[in-house]
Amino acid sequence: MALQQHEPAPFAPQSSLSFTQGFLLGQLSVVLLIGAFIKFFIFGEAPPPPSRGMSNRTTHRRYSSVYSPPQDSQKSLREKPSTSNVLRPVPSTSTNTRSILRKTYYSAIPTNPTSKHGRHRMHHSSHQPESLDWFNVLIAQTIAQYRETAYSLKDSPTSSILSSLTAAMNNPEKKPSFIDKIKVTDISLGEEFPIFSNCRIIAVDDPVSDGGRLQALLDVDLSDDNLSIAVETSMLLNYPKPRSAIIPIALSVSVVRFSGTLCISLIPASTEPPEPLQTPAGSPAPPTSDPRDNAGNRPPGPGEHTASQDELPPKSSPKSNVAFSFLPDYRLDLSVRSLIGSRSRLQDVPKIAQLVEARVHAWFEERVVEPRVQVVGLPDLWPRMGRTGVRPGEDSDAGSTAPPRSAGSTESSGPPRFSDDHGREPEGLRFRGALDSRLGLGAGSRTNSFNVDMGGLRSSSMTRQQSGGARSDHFEMPGAMPAGTPVGTPGIPDN
């Protein structure tokens, strides 16, 4: 009993880790858990490096879950799609003609199986034809701006309507040798505006697009307008020697009335290059929306060098186009006044009037009468800072949101104002000569105009002069701003 009382009690074993060491170990374990969670649940796996030996082998991937779905049933969210499959495909059922008409609540049923040109048409059934009053206002404002622009450029040596028409009609490649220099004596761009009405939507069978394409038909009428052109020239008799005899000729052409049905349709952009249009032998190639293509159609002028295709920058992506034409049942009434001779004069020769009318009708039908159409590229409507501006008189409301102007831009760089010119007749739109007294033309006899083809002379009232002397056949309002004129706020780079 005495030995058991004096025996010492056993001590409890002390921990080998201190409090600080345990705290640090706990923090480290928490950091490791957080890092593992971020790595396996948030971050993705790096793509394996390309290997020639492993290219033909099947790679096995680990799945974090117990259930591994089959590859054919669904795609894993962690798989990155290819660059060609980022944009979701649009089903063809939502882009065809029937789907568009159904979603816009515009139904069309076939009423005429075939048309004059062998195409199947579908006429509207549930909608009454629109009056297009709002469209007439927009077109009238556009034409009025073109007329003001033509007057503002009347003193320009290169961009005026007078210089453009004179250079186009005196083109040595088109004008015959027995015609002397042609001088424009009178130009009138008119005072009235075309009236569009009776708009209807039809569906036309098109083998290129699925379900056909939609086409808008608009009735247009222009009458009692003051649109005309008058020229003076001489017919040369070069036998037995050059300029053996000269016969003065004065000619005035005006349009009494024009009416017809305008067809407008959209042509979607295609990644494939379009096939070149068939043009008659000896005629220039039709212009495209790319100015580099138009420049390549003309011969190099003096001081120019021909650049290879490798030096040109890559072309932009294909754009959608709008095609317009007139149905063959159009009406174009012309008034032709002529005066031939110096001492003994012949006035208003019927044969000359018939020749001029035939050439004008042929010129018009070769370009914009079905089945021929004019194709115009649609502009880029994506908002850009280079084209951003502020309406006049609202600078204070814009405040700091207006884009900054460069130091070189001034107030004079804005659009020209014509407030002082409304009270008087635009002299640039009418060039008077001695033709009025010789032909007896009054103010009411001047209406629409086309330039005259005589022999190989080509009509040019609706053509545009290129920078190198060649002409393109697409329409452009005479006196408009040059194609190279930048549009937008000066001094601001395009983003």
Curated annotation (Swiss-Prot):
Its main location: endoplasmic reticulum. Residues 128-379 form the SMP-LTD domain. It holds the Pfam family MMM1. Keywords: Endoplasmic reticulum, Lipid transport, Lipid-binding, Membrane, Transmembrane, Transmembrane helix, Transport. It is found in: Endoplasmic reticulum membrane. The chain crosses the membrane at residues 23-43. The keyword Cell inner membrane does not apply. GO terms for cellular component: endoplasmic reticulum membrane; ERMES complex. GO terms for biological process: mitochondrial genome maintenance; mitochondrion-endoplasmic reticulum membrane tethering; phospholipid transport; protein insertion into mitochondrial outer membrane. Residues 44-495 are cytoplasmic. Residues 418-428 have a biased composition (Basic and acidic residues). It comes from the Eukaryota. Residues 1-22 are lumenal. GO terms for molecular function: lipid binding. InterPro entries: Mmm1, MMM1_dom, SMP_LBD. Residues 63-94, 269-320, 382-428, 440-495 are annotated as: Disordered. Homodimer. Component of the ER-mitochondria encounter structure (ERMES) or MDM complex, composed of mmm1, mdm10, mdm12 and mdm34. A MMM1 homodimer associates with one molecule of mdm12 on each side in a pairwise head-to-tail manner, and the SMP-LTD domains of mmm1 and mdm12 generate a continuous hydrophobic tunnel for phospholipid trafficking. Belongs to the MMM1 family. This is Maintenance of mitochondrial morphology protein 1. It comes from Penicillium rubens (strain ATCC 28089 / DSM 1075 / NRRL 1951 / Wisconsin 54-1255). The gene is mmm1.
